[in-house]
């Protein structure tokens, strides 16, 4: 169980499935949460998680994620969609994410605020991708 009073920069609510209440934020994977906190501390950039649209924990697949998405409870809840609150160039943002050790990295440049997907999938399944004009372009890492 995560001791949220000991977590800096984030609250349980920021990871919740909006259809299942704040307590669903407890499902976020602890190791993954540690990596997100480290990313926030190392960069100094605030991280705005897109939890209100299912961009963190997805308890039952109600938010349109792929069947094996790492957002899903069945896959360990080790993914978020977010954007940084920074003016840093996208290339620098990518470098910081990759340097932090995330093994699934997606870039969504056409959102209202260009944003990211990060997850902690097994290394042998590592992927980097971008989503442009309704199409995913995948790159092996």
For each feature predicted by the language model, list its residue ranges.
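Feature targets compositionally biased, intrinsically disordered low-complexity regions
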Residues: 20, 53-54, 60-63, 100-105, ...
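Solvent-exposed, flexible loop/coil residues
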Residues: 14, 63, 109
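Active-site acidic/histidine clusters and adjacent loop/turn architecture
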Residues: 1-46
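Extended, low-complexity, intrinsically disordered C-terminal regulatory tails
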Residues: 31-67
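Catalytic cores and adjacent binding grooves of peptidoglycan-active enzymes
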Residues: 68-80, 84-141
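Alpha-helix initiation/capping motif
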Residues: 11, 22, 29-30, 55, ...
């Amino acid at each position: 169980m995560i001791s949220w009073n000991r977590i800096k920069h984030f609250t349980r609510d920021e990871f919740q499935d909006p259809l299942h209440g704040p307590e669903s934020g407890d499902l976020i994977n602890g190791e993954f949460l540690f990596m997100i906190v480290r990313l926030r501390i190392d960069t100094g950039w605030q991280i705005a998680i897109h939890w209100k649209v299912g961009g963190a924990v997805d308890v039952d697949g109600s938010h349109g994620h792929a069947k094996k998405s790492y957002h899903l409870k069945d896959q360990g809840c080790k993914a978020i969609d977010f954007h940084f609150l920074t003016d840093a160039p996208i290339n620098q943002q990518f470098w910081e994410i990759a340097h932090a050790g995330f093994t699934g990295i997606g870039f969504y440049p056409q959102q209202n605020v260009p944003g990211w997907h990060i997850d902690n999938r097994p290394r042998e399944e590592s992927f980097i991708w971008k989503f442009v004009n309704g199409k995913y372009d995948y790159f092996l890492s």
